[in-house]
Amino acid sequence: MADAHSDGRTGSTTPGKITRPETTGTKNTHSDNASTSAPGNSASASASASASASTSTLHSNSSTTTSSPQRMINHNPSTSSLRNINTGGTRIETGTGRGTGAVQNAALTGAALAFSNAMGKATPVVPNKFAGKTQLGGNGLGGKDGALAAATKVRVGGGGSPNNGGGRTRSPSKVSVTDPGMGGEQQIYGYQKVGRERTGESETDGGSVISGGLEYQGGQRIPQKRNQRPNGHLLPPFSGTSETSPNVKNNSAAFMAANLAAKRSRENSPSHTGQNYGMGMGMGKQASPLPSRRQSYASSIDSTDRRVDLSSIPPTSNLVEMWEQPDKGVKKERGLVSNRGNEIVNRQVQKRPVSSHAPIPVLKPAGLTRPVSSHASESSVQSRIASSQAPISEQVKSKPKPVIHPRPSSSQASVPGPSKPVSKPDVQPPPVSSHTTSSEAPKPSPKPPVQKPAIYNTRPASSHGPVPNLSTKPSIQKLSRPVSSHGPPPAKPSAKPSLQSIRPTSSHTLESTESSSKASVQKPSLPPPRRTPANLSVSGDQSTSLPMHAPQPRSMQSPILTTADRTEPASESPTQSPRSSSTTKTPRRSSKPTLPSRPPVSRQSYNNDADDDESSDDSFVSASSQPKPKSPSFRAKIAEQKRLQTSTYAPSMTAKTLSNAMVAGYLASSRASTPSISPGVIQPPAPPPPRRLKKFFHSEHSRTPTPPQNTLSATGVPTMKTTMRKPKTEKELKEEEGEGEKRRAKKHLVKKHPNKHDEGNRKRWRDEITEKERKRYEALWASNKGLFPYTMDPRGEIIEIEGAADTVPGMVVKDLWERSRLGGDVLEEVWELVHGKGYWGRQKQKRFGRLERDEFVVGLWLIDQRLKGRKLPARVNHSLWASAS
């Protein structure tokens, strides 16, 4: 299959190795029934945008001539587990058996030529038309038809293998372009590797930086921000130089092939060959910047895409025409209608920043965004896309000239304004290419895109995802990947703010959106942009403004999405704000794209696939000649940082893991609660002790002394001492109990009203002081007796008081009694009752204001009684004095 093809630009032939992954449709759930043969003149090139479920690799080893910088295009998705994206695309089988091998070879050659054209920067590749089946090997691929055939062939099952289970064998094998001079092979995800300029770490295709996510520079991955380019759109790759030359037609054909090959390779292979090394400076896009992630993506995408891709496959001519008609093919940013054969892959330019703020209304494009979760919708969209593609293909057929290739047009953007877009905006719902202001590619006019440069379709990179907001808001200008502006940036696109809202129009069917952005601008038919903030500001430099699709937050992504799927989440989430669709390695944010707060986590990680396409697509978007391969943008760096994080925690975001966590939490809480006491063991609380029957009329007899506090309670448990006093002896306890019994014995059988005067039962002053009380009072007396034994007689002489040693001076008594806080009148009354033995004729004057032991004890007792609430007696009984002495 080695065939030297003259480079459309340089005419030099360089052997290129084209390896195309043959996708085994093991997981390909989508079977596209539409199988048609390409026009005879195009050698029945069948661009089968069939979803390749698995990353089986068909290595079509073919030596193709790439642009003057010799590059080898390796469709090696299998090795680099690119994600196989089942996009509703038309699978077109031209011929059966090995007959398709030639077509595939031709497609590969076309892709190589397209990329080489971008590389050539001067002359777009002009694939030679191949009559009948063009084979890269013995068969020469030439002319735009050759590109078409090449694209067709690329999509045809590897080696002409029929679609898996009749489903499209979509093995968009990654095209890895190896520049021998650059060193290392470059894999091109998108059709955008045209005119790739390698500067520094990143490469610019047509002035647009294509980053597979992380570029290996010096064998080291360099996260570079990619402009999210609409994966589904076949936008004219911008060559490093203006591709305004007449080769644009060829370039469009090559473009179609390249786009097909790149996207398919990207979609089909779960991960790019991890072996890809940055060319030269490491600027070549790494086929598998994140092979592992790509593999996971591929697996998830395979399942989801295949699931979604249910629509019939439109004829290959539709795909080709879509490409050739800048109006149609171009605008589908992610959901390239013709490009992926109704692949509703819509990998929207959602760089898939995991935390993309607003989910881009990816679902809007009818199948434009292929939400991973919404398969049914995708299938319907695919069908719509297929239908739209059919007319597009017809237009393309009618137009032998490669009408301004949607992407070539942007590469050809050298023409200041998009000339009449040849392709009619057939299904141009709201022009999807609203992303780029320059996506104002000239409306596809029935006439062939004569003014190729005019048709920028500056890759309506966002055509896939964000439907162009009619507002001119330059919110997320496509990170204008400086598509190597082929010449003067398209004046019209710059002049007109692409009203296209970032949100992709309802479907890839918005091929019409691919039609000149003018059509999109003029046609406010666009569904109201769901997210205006991403509206593309029309900037003279379309390259500078690429609408960014806000990467859908992972949470929005269906748990089904694996990391690979996450590359598509924006497209999946209808509400995601479009992130700069062409977030190329060095996406230029002329107008700050409204990036979701979280930088695309895995813009490079899981956008490696989508980003490649996006970068290529978006790069084509801007015709401005700014192929600056900027160093990885800040977003790219952040994405790289978060890529690792997302790879770790993303799996936990699935519904299964969440449910498991919930159940685990519930079980843990239930098991942790009082493990020692099982529910059965828990005993009901003991019933409250029965209340004592209260007497209706409580009498004073019911009063009982405070129960004695024993050192040991009845249960033998020692009770805490409340004071420093000695515990009560048994004798004391018995005495107290006896008193209580005596009182209780006096209960009356007949209850009387408490208010009735019962003279006989009235409590009187106790007649005696208990032994306990007496001892306490005597102790206090003993400690204070004998103080101040001297006094002064009337003559002023100091004399000793008789019996002073056994008495307490009145001054000390007053001090002690006042501690009871009783009133002075009460204390005075008590003093009168006890001093000199009361009123019993004692000679108080002889006492000299001192109290003897019994007097002091009785006085303390009276004070205690008064503190207890009892009234002081009128006189102290003899019994009381007797008990005190």
Swiss-Prot record:
Residues 9-32, 69-83, 293-302, 339-348, 469-478, 534-546 have a biased composition (Polar residues). Residues 1-98, 154-246, 262-652, 671-694, 723-762 are annotated as: Disordered. Residues 773-879 form the EH domain. Residues 743-755 have a biased composition (Basic residues). One of its GO terms (biological process) is lipid metabolic process. Residues 33-68, 84-95, 373-383, 414-425, 505-517, 573-585, 618-633 have a biased composition (Low complexity). Residues 325-335 have a biased composition (Basic and acidic residues). The keyword Secreted does not apply. Residues 156-168 have a biased composition (Gly residues). SUPFAM superfamilies: EF-hand (SSF47473). Keywords: Lipid metabolism. InterPro entries: EF-hand-dom_pair, EH_dom. Gene3D superfamilies: EF-hand (1.10.238.10). Positive regulator of phosphatidylinositol 4,5-bisphosphate turnover and negatively regulates signaling through the cell integrity pathway. Involved in rDNA silencing. Belongs to the IRS4 family. This is Increased rDNA silencing protein 4. The gene is irs4.
